[in-house]
């Protein structure tokens, strides 16, 4: 399904790339315009060039675009120069709350200061230079500085090696948490000269390509990252172990089991030849963090890290740095057994059965003993606070989703109500004061007393209280806030964990802010969990309290290391008489002996032994297969396979599909387990079933491993095991934009139809007549006489078309081809020829040589009659009297004896000036020839009197004429004929401003023998013959393709009337006036049919392909590039009408011009036109649309099917008519199979609901089978193939309906409203309305939940809608499977009915159209899209037309994937920007920000701020804001 908010993919994206330049052609147009405007009309030419000037009147729009493009390019360059976040100087003046995490770290100046290593650090440093070493030092003793020393040494050696031409190598500093990545990177940056990068998973590193990583490796010599990132880089062969010079493991004691530290060693380090392995340096406060044999565990760690444990031999030096605190034991009396408080009892009685509260009950129960009554009760207040309730409700829903009972939704709803009830009970509960006796446990009482001793007075004490549980830390912090010890300022520092309930969510940023406050003294008592023990740079404090005793040596050493001040105290809280607590103290003493043992090791003593060899390290993975790509070295393992598949799945998530993840179905079989891997719907490989294994986990990993191999075999994973789709899929989806939509090339253009050139060479003996009548919409100044157009071949019946006479009176031109021929004598041919040439001379100031053998057509007067039938004899219609009179009289001679009134209602012309043509109106008795003309008349060179005003002779001829002319002749009122030739369009303002009233004398002029009414009609002939030419050329184009298309549709399909016709709502540039409808609506219709036709063809001709293959193959067929190539091959560009009326080319060709301006040279230049490749492709789609509306011999789609085959020019679409599709379809086995009982039952139920009986119920079963349903259980294929087909069928039936109902709406409107009809949102609602959702077969708990919740919501919305049909627009989006199954059902019905489209139309009429009878209610549906909404607000609310939305690609910044910058520019001011990984989402962000800006200002402020005068200028046209894509 296309996204509901996605604009048509064919619309130009207007994406700027950094290396593009402004089009020089546009600049040249501006220059030409300026030059022409400076030229003066000398008055001597026979015709003016007003039309050309008019063509350039829109150049201001082009200039605006140039300015906007330049503005955006400058902005793009500026943004592309932005450096990475750690290179930007930190704004120290901003409060911490406004700073990013990276800036918070930088602001604290971690690691700043001189590097001053102590002797013990130098000792370990020297050891680490020559051998792999694990440094065991107390927390706070400066292990990181040893690492810095080692890095400096390693980097110095690396720089020397690089200078000698050796391969580049990189240092890696590995950490175990995101927080440490920030901290250690800050330390290294402040102590190393070389660039340091730091990365962690939340940055999206798993989706980075090798090229991105190569940029980072090139840029940085040291990389700090979490261990899993390096592990994946090594497995994907983004980097090889031999390219690393040192591996530093922070908190190296984590190297065990399947920790990424251990996997890096096992899977990559030990696989490398010994000589190419990097140096290893591990750091830890204790080499072990578990209970057990200390020496054995230490030895195992050495083996895993291929290193030697070492520590300082001079403890006095260490003591100076890492001061040991005074260790104290704070004893407390034996705790009570856990008990139920009154609040606990009350809640347990009412809500004790609720699973979502189980953890809180458990904590409150234990807290009653460990913390006391008050703390136990306060846990409920925190757990059921208002901000936590939504999370608990979500937990209830999640639990309900995992059930299969049909009453789950109701029970879940009740559970949520019970949670709310519990919250209200807690809110109304009267909590006792913690000061009350018995409210606090003995343990908390001791802590309170001791802290009161430290903080009861002004003090510099800083304290950390360590707890085992996060909730304990939170409750204790709340308690001590309440107790109000005078100088105690409590705070909390707990770890980051996703999915927490009870308000315990905390971010890395909040951790840093707590540390910053602790450092500055704003907090002086931190209640912390283990997150404060390990590695974090917590400033020295003088009191550390173990509220909960440590569990391991490492916890003890690390927490003790936090007490670094001189005379600091480390207090352990121990229960009196608790043997376990006492035993733990003894264990720590034994572990301390281990550290002493480490320190006494001789320098050459190795703890390698023979009982821990490499075989034991690798033994765990024995039997697990691996696969290595030789070219890159990338390695596939059982562990990495699942991660690779997860990455592959996420690369397919281009829309909001919930299921862009891998599904693993593990089933028992013959005492073993087999796993089926099901990949997301968009994957071309659906998955596979793995080999049997004895464990579920091994079966899952084995199947994932085999799936990776299958994807690799099908070239869906690259040489680094990355999905190819982060590059390929967008390119395929954007195939419609894979050609240039802006750049144009010159192509040949036919300016005259070939029909005019046929049968020439001799005078005609017979001609075919076409009767031309004028039907004005209102009274005209002159009654137009009908005309006859005679041609050598019979003309087709042309559609009626309008022209605009007088003051834009719309007049319909009706052409009627006569059936009978006109047989002619030589004299009659001569009469026709003379009349036609006389029209050219008298009316248009062109005198041609009389050559009837070269003439293409003849014009003749017709007898005036209301109408003529085609069967009439042309000889009876022709006005022979007028024809003979014109032949015998060159003009009507002037006579002084004539009655003055006899000169009225004649056509008069100046023989020497083509601009002067008049219709006489009446005698003006108030003027004489010597009178000055009235001041309002049009200006001419001589204005001294009427006689001179009419005279165009040269100086000498003028004097001679004036000396002999008759100064007593009458002066006539006359109407000056405008120089307007393009009557196909209304007048321009310039043409309208021409003054047509004038006064003339007859003697200086010539009176035409052509009757005035006929001359008036002949003035329209250039427009009429131009339109006839266009019809004939379009017909010729269709005939060249062997299409039978209606003439009006053919011309519409070939008509491009502006430079940017395809930008429907944009202000059109260089508009060609009077061309009629352009191709855009037909292109919209044809595009839809093309999609449907190719979908059907692929479905029928490729039964074994899956949906992905169909999508890719269809895109290759319908993409603009393919259409363009086919069009060029068939020379379709010749027939495209890209120019409107031309006063240069409407004249007949081949005649010899004797007098008048020769336009032949200009006509030659107009035989070429500039077309964009996309325009040519769009015309192909328009031709398909025209063929569709023209029908066919057997089926109304026949001609359109033939057009598709011709224009896609591919073996994948071979049908010549509609019924060919059926003949190509081979019924698959599953469809022919006899239906079982369940399938028959489903068929009957659907027939009851939708009134269609399936001949093949198995088709219906396939339509309702979700891709998640395991193939082992399914008897039919999933619905994807049918959904692909049905999607195009629904598109077609909806578009046809809108196209027919709204003939005057532009494609943008049609697209926006089609979006509502075919949107996932509507089709999902329709699925529930029709009750289809209950029949879907799937295997997914989240899917069940989503369907249930959505069905309840949409049914509730319908019930509350009071009959409103648009109730579905206000609900959340449905699960994608629901619209998919509707589309699949439509596809199944289509196939089952033998491709009967009428069945689809019936489904549309019965179930879809009732929702869309009134399309006005969906006007805002598309407008909710930010880009459309912004367009509407700027144009309608603010009246602005000078704005645009530009988007352009930016180079990669700080190694991130290449981004796209979008900007909204209003009157050359950038008002909003947005960046994203695609143009679509960048435009959305920019539009949203721009809307926020507009929300803050009024219309008056807008005009003042942006100097917008669009409303005042009255320019109602609209500029291109760009599209949503």
Swiss-Prot record:
Domain Helicase ATP-binding: 124-305
Residue stretches making up the Helicase C-terminal domain: 439-605
GO biological process: defense response to virus; regulation of defense response to virus; siRNA processing
Gene3D superfamilies: Dicer dimerisation domain, P-loop containing nucleotide triphosphate hydrolases, Ribonuclease III domain
MF annotations from Gene Ontology: ATP binding; DNA binding; helicase activity; metal ion binding; ribonuclease III activity; RNA binding
Alphabetical keyword list: Antiviral defense, Antiviral protein, ATP-binding, Helicase, Hydrolase, Magnesium, Manganese, Metal-binding, Nucleotide-binding, Repeat, RNA-binding, Zinc
Residues binding ATP, per UniProt: 137-144
InterPro entries found in the cross-reference section: Dicer_dimer_sf, Dicer_dimerisation_dom, DSRM_2, Helicase/UvrB_N, Helicase_ATP-bd, Helicase_C-like, P-loop_NTPase, PAZ_dom
CDD domains per UniProt: DEXHc_dicer (cd18034), RIBOc (cd00593), SF2_C_dicer (cd18802)
SMART domains according to UniProt: DEXDc, HELICc, RIBOc
Site (Important for activity): 1376
Annotated binding of Zn(2+), by residue: 1440, 1467, 1508, 1510
Every Dicer dsRNA-binding fold domain range: 641-731
Assigned EC number: 3.1.26.-, 3.6.4.-
Segments for region (Disordered): 37-65
Cofactor(s) in the UniProt record: Mg(2+); Mn(2+)
Residue positions of motif DEAH box: 250-253
Biased composition (Acidic residues): 37-52
GO cellular component: cytoplasm; nucleus
Span of domain RNase III: 1032-1192, 1243-1394
SUPFAM superfamilies: P-loop containing nucleoside triphosphate hydrolases, RNase III domain-like
Similarity section: Belongs to the helicase family. Dicer subfamily.
Function as written in the Swiss-Prot or TrEMBL entry: Dicer-like endonuclease involved in cleaving double-stranded RNA in the RNA interference (RNAi) pathway. Produces 21 to 25 bp dsRNAs (siRNAs) which target the selective destruction of homologous RNAs leading to sequence-specific suppression of gene expression, called post-transcriptional gene silencing (PTGS). Part of a broad host defense response against viral infection and transposons.
Name of the molecule in the record: Dicer-like protein 1
Gene name, Swiss-Prot/TrEMBL: dcl1
